[in-house]
Regions:
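Arg/Lys-rich, low-complexity, intrinsically disordered N-terminal tails that contact nucleic acids
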Residues: 1-25
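Extended, polar beta-sheet/loop recognition surfaces of beta-rich domains
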Residues: 7-9, 106, 166-193
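Glycine-centered small-residue hotspots that permit tight backbone geometry or close packing
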Residues: 10, 83-85, 123, 147, ...
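Short, cationic Gly/His-enriched loop motifs
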Residues: 18-41, 46-132, 136-137
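Structured segments of extracytoplasmic/periplasmic soluble domains
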Residues: 38, 69, 162-165, 169
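A short, exposed loop/beta-hairpin motif centered on an aromatic-Gly-Thr core
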Residues: 54-58, 142-153
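An aromatic-rich alpha-helical recognition segment common to small helix-rich domains
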Residues: 124, 135, 149-163
C-alpha cells in the first residue's frame, strides 16, 4: 500500500497519534499540515514568499514523529504558534532542535515586513511633509514616532534601539508564560542589520 503524501513530502505512519478527533483535525495534525504547507505549497509561496527556501527536517516528514514532539513540548496546547527561527535567527528548517511554541503577539513582533517597506531599512519611511526620514515603531498595531532624521541610517539606528528595548519589555511581560529558551532568546535579541 502506498502512503498518501502531504505536499509531496509528508506522510502518516499510522501510529498512536490521531489526525482526526470528533470530526475535526487534531491540533497536532493541523500544526503539522500548516508547517508542510508553509514549506512545500507553491501556491502559498506566491502569497507568502518569505517561506521560500524553508524546509522540514526529515524526522518530521512523518506526522507521528512530529506529534510525539508536539505533545511533549511545553505550550503546544495553549494556542501558541510553532516558530522555527526565534532560537536560531534566520533559520529556515523546521526541526525538533530549533522549534518552539510562542504566542502570536511575540511571533508577529519579530516580523520584518520587508515586502511592504520598499528599499528603506526596517522601521524607516520617507515623510513628505518634513522632507526627512521618519523612524517609527509599531506597538500594538499603532505607530509610535521616534523622530525625523536627515538620512535613513540614523533613522534606522533609532528604530533598532527602540525595537530591541521593546522586545526585551515584551519578554519580561511574557516571562513565566513562555519557554525559558524563548525568554532568553528575546532578552538577547538584536535586530539584524
Amino acid at each position: 500500500m502506498t502512503k498518501k503524501l502531504i505536499y509531496g513530502i509528508g506522510y502518516n505512519s499510522k501510529g498512536v497519534h490521531k489526525t482526526i478527533k470528533n470530526g475535526k483535525r487534531t491540533k497536532s495534525y493541523q500544526a503539522w499540515r500548516d508547517m508542510m504547507r508553509r514549506c512545500y505549497d507553491t501556491d502559498f509561496h506566491e502569497i507568502q514568499p518569505t517561506y521560500l527556501g524553508c524546509s522540514v527536517d526529515t524526522r518530521w516528514h512523518d506526522f507521528q514523529s512530529f506529534a510525539e514532539w508536539f505533545y511533549s513540548h511545553p505550550y503546544s496546547d495553549s494556542g501558541y504558534q510553532l516558530d522555527k527561527d526565534i532560537l536560531v535567527h534566520g533559520n529556515k528548517v523546521y526541526s525538533p532542535d530549533s522549534c518552539v511554541f510562542i504566542p502570536k503577539q511575540l511571533n508577529v513582533l519579530l516580523n520584518n515586513s520587508r515586502s511592504s517597506r520598499g528599499g528603506l531599512p526596517q522601521g524607516v519611511c520617507w515623510d513628505k511633509q518634513s522632507a526627512k526620514y521618519k523612524a517609527q515603531l509599531s506597538i500594538n498595531g499603532r505607530h509610535k514616532n521616534l523622530g525625523l532624521f536627515s538620512n535613513p541610517q540614523d533613522a534606522h539606528t533609532s528604530y533598532k534601539k527602540a525595537k530591541e528595548a521593546y522586545v526585551r519589555d515584551k519578554a519580561i511581560e511574557w516571562r513565566g508564560r513562555i519557554d525559558r529558551s524563548v525568554y532568553h532568546s528575546l532578552m538577547n535579541w538584536q535586530l539584524a542589520t
